[in-house]
Amino acid sequence: MAATLPLSPINHQLCRFGNNSLTTHRFCSPGFLISSPCFIGLTGMGSATQLRARRSLISSAVATNSLLHDVGATVAVLGGAYALVLSFESLTKRNVIQQSLSRKLVHILSGLLFVLAWPIFSGSTEARYFAAFVPLVNGLRLVINGLSISPNSMLIKSVTREGRAEELLKGPLFYVLALLFSAVFFWRESPIGMISLAMMCGGDGIADIMGRKFGSTKIPYNPRKSWAGSISMFIFGFFISIALLYYYSSLGYLHMNWETTLQRVAMVSMVATVVESLPITDQLDDNISVPLATILAAYLSFGY
């Protein structure tokens, strides 16, 4: 039998209820159990077993809480994404905004809002997959409409260039796949996914709007692109990338050396801008070329 230490009057008062297991657990800390008669009826092995059981219960409770948290976050983000597209569908239907502007605003906002919503998910390792479920559902919706299985004319009109259902299987589908890929493989701990989505959503999206409005002077090697669009892509892509990195740094997910980060992001933005300006759109959609080029450049710059 393990030796016990003398008890103070307070010890006696706390532990005289030792026959009641509930009271013992409440008033006798692990320290008391080791050195006092509160340990009546328990062996060292029994105490260790109880501690393991408690840890198991706590772990199960935490896992359940994380699961419910992530399910709720998924529902909220999915609802927000649907509401965003629905609102622009309505605006396009009522001719409040042009189809081309509606498409680009959806392009800009849906991806950036998705990235901004990542912190509402839990800290579990499975949280990224719950987040990725949102673009997965939207991708399935695009496939269903793109194959004309259940076409939604307003969706087609609001997110395509020419209003054809098969267009949903190109740029828009590549777009949601880029969101899914960034969430699963980079998530909140890497600047790579954030920068790639900033360039694809913000930089490329704003480049198109500015190019249409101010793009009279074309780039010599690609008459479909303008200096105004390319300059806008570099500037807005750079600042949106920095804003996202600062956002995640302030929340404690990233730890950046800002002097080198500014230089690296500028370099990545330049690479993405040059790739977007190349005359390869007919062969490779911007929603593939821009995120791929950005991911490669960001990986070479940041290394994680």
From Swiss-Prot:
Protein localization: Plastid, Chloroplast membrane
Protein family according to the UniProt entry: Belongs to the polyprenol kinase family.
Disruption phenotype: 50% reduction in tocopherol content in leaves. Plants able to grow on soil and to produce fertile seeds. Vte5 and vte6 double mutants can grow photoautotrophically and show a stay-green phenotype with strongly delayed senescence and extended lifetime.
Catalyzed reaction equations: phytol + CTP = phytyl phosphate + CDP + H(+)
InterPro entries named among the record's database cross-references: Phytol/farnesol_kinase (IPR039606)
Enzyme Commission code(s) on record: 2.7.1.182
Protein name: Phytol kinase 1, chloroplastic
Membrane topology, from the record: Multi-pass membrane protein
Keyword Membrane: yes
Pathway membership: Cofactor biosynthesis; tocopherol biosynthesis
Species lineage: Eukaryota, Viridiplantae, Streptophyta, Embryophyta, Tracheophyta
Alphabetic keyword roster: Chloroplast, Kinase, Membrane, Plastid, Transferase, Transit peptide, Transmembrane, Transmembrane helix
Transmembrane segments: 71-91, 105-125, 129-149, 167-187, 191-211, 227-247
Principal subcellular localisation of the protein: plastid
One GO BP: vitamin E biosynthetic process
Any GO molecular function: phytol kinase activity
Function field: Kinase involved in the activation and reutilization of phytol from chlorophyll degradation in plant metabolism, including tocopherol biosynthesis. Catalyzes the conversion of phytol to phytol monophosphate (PMP) in the presence of CTP or UTP. No activity with ATP or GTP as phosphoryl donor.
Top enzyme category: transferase
One GO term describing the cellular component: chloroplast
Transit peptide region: 1-59
